[in-house]
Structure formats: structure tokens, C-alpha cells
Amino acid sequence: TNLNCLGNVLTALDVSNSPSLEFLDCYGNNLTSLDVSNNTALTYLAVGYNQLDSLDVSSNTALTTLRCHFNQLTSLDVSANTSLTILDCYNNSLTSLDVSANTALTTLICHHNSLTSLDVSSNTALARLECNHNSLTSLDVSTNTALIWLSCFSNQLTSLDVSANTALRWLHCRYNQLTSLDVSTNTSLTYLNCEANQLTSLDVSSNTALGQLDCGNNQLTSLDVSSNTPLYQLVCGNNQLASLDVSSNTALTLLYCQTNQLTSLDVSNNTALSNLRCSNNQLTSLDVSSNTALTQLRFYSNQITEIDLSSNTAIGNLECGSNQLTSLDVSSNTALTSLACQNNQLTYLNMKNGLTEQVTDFNATNNSLTCIEILDPAWATSN
């Protein structure tokens, strides 16, 4: 027997006379309590997005799926639910969670709670674990060799050992206090986000399947991505990189390498690039003539004296302020909607692209402009 009453405005629901009920979905109502003690046949229970402050599932020993996220639960006892394979209890106020009896669990999503510890050593079938946005100081996943997806970001982890998790494809551990991270055995990784930790080095040479890498806001002095040829997103800003070689990463569409110590940047092989941010470095030149797919280009706060944008007709957002440009020609950039070229040495600015009225964000202050060429004098007067 199934009952689906999701997305209503129910404040009460009585299912006490339905002992044969197997499927109950009352997601997205205004329930403050729910009694399922008589529903011993339940295998699926979804009570997410209600206002429950307690939930007793001790009688529901047949449960395989329990979704109780976005409530006000302060505790949850699932010790009797040994058949559970999926448990979603995220966005509650749980301070502890005991899943030691739930050895069949394949998915555990408990993020956005107040957990200070989490023991998943008994959950050897676990393929997906999301425990981010808690207060965890440690996490042992050494027995979880089936893990494919691990999100443990925004905790207080000082170390993370994923050497046993060779099936891992997705690892998100940003906003912790990690000083090292060894991913050499995780050769199936396609996504790695270790941003905002305290990493001084990162070896991704074994991760040849990586498509997305975010290692920004660390203390990296070098980064070798030559083995990561499928990479299409690389975020490595706010580190201490003195050089960056992306010549092998021809699939790159997004590259954020701002706020480093780069003196040069060669993106001539990265013809698929649509978004490039390399601001706050020490670049004296930048060649983007091969990057015809660029829609966003930010290279402010460098030492660039000239830039040729004639090939970049798709650029919509251009930020080139605080350089040493003496002239700027955006006449070919007919998609331009935002231009920030302040704090340069501009004496000449060519905006004769025929579409000046579409530029909604324009800043050319603190220059020495004597001429701005446009096709629409009325626009110049009003802007």
C-alpha cells in the first residue's frame, strides 16, 4: 500500500489504521509530529521538509529508505532499522548519530547538523557519504572501500586518509584544516575539491581521470597538472604558485589562477577556455589570441602594458584594471556588457563596437584618457 501526500499544507496526518502501508511520502508539509508505530510494514518513509522535532522509527524494522531531512530533529535512533540502505537526515539539529547497526547502508547524507563525531566503520557497503557542514574533528573511512562519493567539507578535520578508498570518484574536503592530502591511490577520481585548507603540496599525477580540480586558498608553491588531460575546470587561485603549465590541459574551459606569483601564463593550447581569471599576479604580458571562446576575462592587478582582444569576440565581461595599459581596443568585442579598465595609464579607448548601449557596467576611472571612440555619442554623455 502506498500513500503519497507530498507538497501540501498538512498539519496533521493519521496513518495509525494503515498497518499494511509500505510506502509513505509526506514530504513538504507542515507536520509537527508523525506517529508511524503501527506501520510495521513500511519500507520507504519520506518526511523531509516538515517541522518535526522528533521521529520514532523503532517499530519500522522493514525500512530500507528513510528521508527525514530539513526538520528540527535533535536526535534520531535508527538502531532497529537494520535493513536501511538509504538514510537522509541532513539539515536538522543532530548532535550525534549512531549508524553502527545499519550495516546495509549504501547512502548516508547527514550534512548540516551539529555532529562532533561520526563512526562509519560498520558501514562497509557505504558508497555515498555526505557529512559536510558539521563539527567533525576526525573521520575514519578506512573500512569504507566501496565509497564512490565523499563530501566532508566545512568541518574541522586536520587529517583525512582516503588511501583505502580506491573506488572514490568524488572527493570534496574543502574548508577544513588539512595540512596534507594523499590521493595517489584514488585513480578513479573525476572531481577533487580541497580548497581552503593548509596544503603546501598536492600530487595529482596518479589522478588521470580528473575533470575538475579546485585546490585554491591553500599554500601550494607548485602544481603539476600535466597528467590530468581530461581536466576542464582548474581552480588554483590564492596560493603561492610561481609558475603554472596548462599546455597539456586542452579541454580546459575554466581556469582560475588569480592571486599567485605568476610572472607568465601560456594559454595558447587552451582553445576551449571560456572563463579565465589570472588577476593579482606579476604578469607583464598575456596572449589570448587563441582563446576565441572566452566569455569572461579578468587579469586586473598585473603589470600588463598591452592586450590584443581582436580575436575574442565572445567576451562579455572584461576586467583589466590596475595594469599599465596605455591603450585599449574593444571594438571587436561586440558581446561586451561589462568593462572595468580603471587604474591604468590609458590615453586611448576604442569602444566602436556598435553596441555601447549594452555595456551596463563601465569603469575607466583613474586613467589619462584624452579620447574614447564610440559610435553612440548620446550613450557617452549619459554614462
Segments predicted by a language model, with ranges:
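Leucine-rich solenoid repeat scaffolds
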Residues: 347-383
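Conserved hydrophobic beta-strand positions in leucine-rich repeat
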Residues: 1-3, 22-26, 43-47, 64-68, ...
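Low-complexity tandem-repeat tracts in intrinsically disordered regions
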Residues: 22, 53, 64, 72, ...
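Leucine-rich repeat
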Residues: 17-21, 38-42, 59-63, 80-84, ...
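Intrinsically disordered, low-complexity repeat tracts
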Residues: 1, 5, 11, 32-33, ...
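Short linear segments in intrinsically disordered or otherwise low-structure-confidence regions
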Residues: 57, 75, 96-99, 120, ...
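Consensus "Asn ladder" position of solenoid repeat domains
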Residues: 8, 29, 50, 71, ...
